[in-house]
Curated annotation (Swiss-Prot):
It holds the Pfam family DMRL_synthase. This is 6,7-dimethyl-8-ribityllumazine synthase. It comes from the Bacteria. One of its GO terms (cellular component) is cytosol. Its EC number is 2.5.1.78.
Amino acid sequence: MNKIEGHVIGTDLKIGIVVSRFNDFITSKLLSGAEDTLLRHGVKADDIDVAWVPGAFEIPLIAKKMAETKKYDAVITLGTVIRGATSHYDYVCNEAAKGIAASSMSTGVPVIFGVLTTDTIEQAVERAGTKAGNKGAEAAAAAIEMANLTRSLQ
């Protein structure tokens, strides 16, 4: 049986990152975690492009545009949606998730879901570099692995 898997060596990879400005006190920490992980795994700083969008709902369009250029081996999406008193949370989370997945499927470029969907600010803070690690860093590691796995299947 042949085993096919990616590795986490980022040398020669070009990575796009789409980050939401909404809740930037969280998303900036996710971005720092992602950038640090990419650099530690060999991606050069000049090979990382960051696009800022207003909110999580706007992430899929820019992720798809970045992926369509074929300039990037993977695109990382980072955002934070925190539940409020209305159903707005559900719409934003669902559409962001669907759009991000569709971006990957329609372009063949790994588009990694790094959007936090939490009930509280505290949960978001925990996932942006405290108790629960940094989900931006995890998304970056997944991007490297998926970029390499995708390359190996071409």
